[in-house]
Amino acid sequence: MARQVSLEKTRNIGIMAHIDAGKTTTTERILYYTGVTHKIGEVHEGAATMDWMEQEQERGITITSAATTCFWGDHRVNIIDTPGHVDFTIEVERSLRVLDGAVAVFCSVGGVEPQSETVWRQADKYRVPRIAFINKMDRVGADFFRGVGMIRDRLKANPVPIQLPIGAEDTYRGVVDLVEMKAIIWDEESLGAKYHEAEIPADLAEMAQEYREKLIEEIATFDDALMEKYLGGEELTTDEIKAAVRKATIDIQICPVICGSAFKNKGVQNLLDSVVAYLPSPLDIPAITGIDAKSGEEITRKASDDEPFSALAFKIMTDPFVGQLCFFRVYSGVLNSGSYVYNSTKEKKERIGRLLKMHANKREEIKEVYAGDIAAAVGLKYTTTGDTLCPEDSPVVLESIEFPEPVIAIAIEPKTKADQEKLGISLQKLASEDPSFRVRTDEETGQTIISGMGELHLEIIVDRLMREFKVEANVGKPQVAYRETVTKKVKVEGKFVRQSGGRGQYGHVWIELEPQEAGKGYEFVDAIKGGVVPREYIPAVDKGIQEAMETGVLAGYPTVDFKVALVDGSYHEVDSSEMAFKIAGSMAFKEAAAKAGPVLLEPIMSVEVVVPEEYMGDVIGDLNSRRGRIMGMEGRAGAQVVSAMVPLAQMFGYATDLRSATQGRATYTMTFDHYEQVPKSVSEEIVAKVKG
C-alpha cells in the first residue's frame, strides 16, 4: 500500500488556548466540517468527541490531548487538542514538541488571558509557527481589534489580520478576506455551514483597503522581490500574497489573525483553509536533529520515506479495549505493523503489535505509517513519553521532552487489602501516562505519596483511580513539597571504622560543602590529591552523599543547590570497602549540612486573579494575609487583573475562599514560579510539626 497523501499536503497542528476560549468546540467543528462526525458534539452537553474521558465530559475541560486525523480537500490534517488548564501544561509541552504548527484560539471578549501567555511561551520555546483565531465574535463585548492589540502587547508577537469582522456581537455576520479582497457572508439557515461571497460592504471598504495595505507592507518587509513590486506601484496577485504570508508565518515573522464563532459554526471553514494555506508541512520545517546512539555524534533525519525510520513517543494512554496505546510522531522513514523497532532511549527492542489511526475516540487499523504522520501503536512494553523509536542498525536518540518537578503531594491509602494491590498497579500505569505525576513510598511512615502539578491535577488522578481502575482509596490533606538548602561553607570529617573480629570496615573522608545559586542543583567535585582516597572508592562517597541528601537535617526534606568537594581522607589496605566509604560520605554530609546554616525552601506560585473592580480591595487584602507579594495590577475588559507571588502552602482551598469573597465572579490561575527561603517564624513551626 503506497502513501496516500504526499508530505507537502500533510499538516500536524495543535489547537492551543486558555480554558474556555473555545478550543474543544473549535476542534469539534473542524471534525464536523471535514466530514468525520455526523452529529456535532457540544461541550456543555458533555458529548464532545475530543473530550472522551468521563471526567472531561463532566467538568467540560480537556485533560488529555487526543490526536485526530481528518481531511480538508486533498490535505490530511492531524489535530492534537491540548488542554488549557495550567495544571496540565505538561500535556501542552509534549504535544507542541511533535507539532509543525498551531492554531491559537483567543476569546474575543477576554483577549489574551494568563494561560494564553504560558502556552505562547511554550510554543516560542519549540519555535512553532502559529495562526491566531479570535473566537466567540458573537458574544456581548466582542472586540476583534482589542484582541489583536493584546496579542501584540502581551505576547510580544507580530499579529497581522488577514480578515476583518463584518459586525460584532449579535450583528456578526461575516468577514472581509483581505487577501482576496472579498466579503464572506454566513448563511444563517444552514447554521453557518454554507456561506456565499459578496462585495465588501460600502461602510467597510475604506478600512479594508487600509488593512490590506498594512498586510502587504508587513509581508513585503520579509520579501525583497515583493517589496520592489509594491514600491513600483504594481498590483500583487493573490497567489503572491498567499505565498509571502505563508513564508513569513513559517519563519515566525508574523502571526496571521482570523476570526469567527465556532459555537455558531461561523468561520471554521476559513480556519481550515488558513491552516492548509499558511501552516507548515513536515517539509517546511528544519530536519530533526538527534544523537547517533553508536558514535555519539549529532545527525539529522529528513522528512522522507527513504530515510531510516525515526519517531518520538509523545503520549501513553490506557484504552479500555486495546490496552496501552503509545502515540508517536514519525519524523522519517516508514513503519509496518508487526515489525520490530528499537527504543534507543531505553536500549530495548520492541515489537509493534498493531498500528492505529485515531479519531478522538474511534480507531482505524492501518498497515503502515509514513514520515510526517502521527499514529498510535499497541504492544509496546517499555516505551514511555519522550522515547525515540528507530531501527536497531541505525539508532538515533531524538531530543527528549523535559518535565517539571511536581510541587504538591498527598498521601493516599487503600481502603481494603484487595485495593492495596490494585492501587500499586494503577498508580504505576498513571505515572507511565503522565510524567509530571510521581509516586513514591515514604520510608518512615510507609505511606504512598503521590505528587503533581496542582490540586486539580491530583484530584483528577484520584478520580481516575476510582473510576477507571475501580480502586477505593482514602486521600490525605495536600502537602507542600518543601526543600532544604545550606547558607554557609563548612569543612567536616566523616569517619566510619568498625574493627571487631573478622574483617573490619574503614572509610574516612574530609569534605567541603558550600551553597550554590538557586536552581543549580547538586554538584560533586573530586579534589583528592596523591591518591589518599583510592579512585575506586570516590563514586561511593558521591553515592553516600546523594542518598543522605534525600532526607535533609532540618525536617527531612530533600536538600538542594549545594556543592561538595571531596578534599582529603585516608584508607586501610584491608578493611576499606565501597560500603565503608559510602557510609563515611553520608555521615560527613549530615554533619556538614547541620553546621552549614540549613534553611527551608518553599514553592512560590505566580497567581493571577481576574476580579471585578468592587472586590479588588478584599482580594488584595486576602492575598497579603496569605504572605503574598502583589506584583502588579491592570485593567482588562471591565475587570482588574491582580498578579502576585504567594507561597503554595497558603493557597490550599483558595478557589473556595475566592468564590465566596466575590460571589463567584472572580477567577484565578496559578503556576509554580520558584523556590524561596521560608521566613524564620514559619520555618520553626514546620520543623516543630515534623519533629512533633
UniProtKB/Swiss-Prot annotation:
PANTHER family: RIBOSOME-RELEASING FACTOR 2, MITOCHONDRIAL (PTHR43261:SF1), TRANSLATION ELONGATION FACTOR G-RELATED (PTHR43261)
Cellular-component GO terms for this entry: cytoplasm
GO molecular function, a single term: translation elongation factor activity
Main location: cytoplasm
Protein name: Elongation factor G 2
Family: Belongs to the TRAFAC class translation factor GTPase superfamily. Classic translation factor GTPase family. EF-G/EF-2 subfamily.
Coiled-coil residue spans: none
Domain tr-type G: 8-283
A single GO BP: ribosome disassembly
CDD domains, A to Z: EF-G, EFG_III, EFG_mtEFG1_IV, EFG_mtEFG_C, EFG_mtEFG_II
InterPro entries cross-referenced by the UniProt entry: EFG_II, EFG_III, EFG_III/V, EFG_IV, EFG_V, EFG_V-like, EFTu-like_2, G_TR_CS
Entries under NCBIfam families matching the protein: EF-G, PRK12740.1-3, PRK12740.1-5, small_GTP
Positions annotated to bind GTP: 17-24, 81-85, 135-138
UniProtKB keywords: Cytoplasm, Elongation factor, GTP-binding, Nucleotide-binding, Protein biosynthesis
Cellular localisation: Cytoplasm
Job of this protein: Catalyzes the GTP-dependent ribosomal translocation step during translation elongation. During this step, the ribosome changes from the pre-translocational (PRE) to the post-translocational (POST) state as the newly formed A-site-bound peptidyl-tRNA and P-site-bound deacylated tRNA move to the P and E sites, respectively. Catalyzes the coordinated movement of the two tRNA molecules, the mRNA and conformational changes in the ribosome.
